[in-house]
Curated annotation (Swiss-Prot):
Gene3D superfamilies: 3.30.70.100, Rhodanese-like domain. One of its GO terms (molecular function) is oxidoreductase activity, acting on paired donors, with incorporation or reduction of molecular oxygen. The keyword Transmembrane does not apply. Belongs to the TrhO family. The active site is at residue 185. This is tRNA uridine(34) hydroxylase. One of its GO terms (biological process) is tRNA modification. It catalyses: uridine(34) in tRNA + AH2 + O2 = 5-hydroxyuridine(34) in tRNA + A + H2O. PROSITE patterns: RHODANESE_3. NCBIfam families: PRK00142.1-2. The gene is trhO. InterPro entries: Rhodanese-like_dom, Rhodanese-like_dom_sf, Rhodanese_C, TrhO, TRHO_N. SMART domains: RHOD (SM00450). Its EC number is 1.14.-.-.
Amino acid sequence: MSVPKIVLFYVFTPLADPEAVKLWQLNLAQRSGVKGRIIVSEQGINATVGGDIHDVKAYVRGLKEYAPFQHADIKWSDGAGDDFPRLSVKVRPELVTFDAPDLIRVTEHGVEGGGTHLTPHEVHELVERRGEDVVFFDGRNQLEAEIGRFRGAVVPRTETTRDFLRELDSGAYDHLKDKALVTYCTGGIRCEVLSGLLRNRGFRDVYQLDGGIVRYGEAYGDRGLWDGSLYVFDERRHMEFSLSARSLGRCVQCGEATPRYVNCANQQCRRLFLCCETCTGAGARTRCADCVPVAA
């Protein structure tokens, strides 16, 4: 019986020959039988792949045979069976596209100058100790935060990761420079960079949630400071940490709570938006708010 699994991981470490690592990763993934997205750069590797549990384990074993990746923090989750339509392995200038390659220095120890890493338990201790002085700062895009976020979190106005530099330089968050900022994202990689960019701009007390929302959910589920669902970058689109998770997202058609994203039916758009199963099943127009007047 097939048991589908998905793994998420990243490693910041200098790679002298990203093209060679790309070819090795392509061969390893194909040989193991996994699909997903793998990004390689001079800064390291960032990947989300899935498949049958035996295939995924074979991939992880092969990955850790390469010394720079042997200590990769592998985050496991349940898959649905066909979570990735294909395998993509690419070389890019940055592991995460902040458009700031010259502002980031990576050594064999990771990203230099980033925020202090905190485990989920240490985050709770910080909140207990400093109360309202602690501010959660979302390192994801607005779309992702619609269905789930930390309670009271600041969610920057971003459509892509490239928008963060513009947002930070706008001065809109300067009033938080004396706060204890806890940055968070899905698995932790975006906050490795974002926390450093914040510190470079005068934010003095910056932290990052080690392992991201995924590790927090494993530790506390829906019993802690997290509310809602977690947006994920595969065919599932979202995952929950318990059956009692409360959805924060709202269907654009009827306003009911839903974590369900669909693509706009307008072929010139295809933007993701929230639409519940009832509205989709009832044949309601599955177009985003911007495209409702546009014929599909």
